[in-house]
Amino acid sequence: MDLKSKVFLIASIMTVFSTMVIPGETSAETTQNTVTITPINDEISLKKTVTTMNVPQDNKLPWGSVIGAPSEYVERYPVIIQFYSGEDPVHFAQVDVKGDGSFEYKFRVRNFDSNTGEFVNIFEGDYTVKIFRVIPNTEKFV
């Protein structure tokens, strides 16, 4: 590995660590969540959470994330995350639930184009984020 590659690698690592420490401007509104629970059968239901995400035009951070707090879950059912710009689907993801019922999905918001030497915003503006997870039924449905 030549000196230029080593310097680039070290600079990249330092950038990642610094972006993890500095709070970002990318936000998802948690006060305006819409939650719908639809029974699948007697034992499990599908919990759908709809929220919004805003990525400002002047964003400098490379990563965004969707994080779910520990809660009840059903084993072997992943969380499905869907991003929409208006009605247009933009990005879909599937992530496993951790043992405590939490989940985390990290995704690129900004990327470096090595051909042009410029940063490119992958996400910019307002998005609707739909999160689907399977939960155990707490009540019997008739």
Predicted regions and their residues:
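Ser/Thr-rich low-complexity repeats and stalk/linker segments
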Residues: 2-12, 16-142
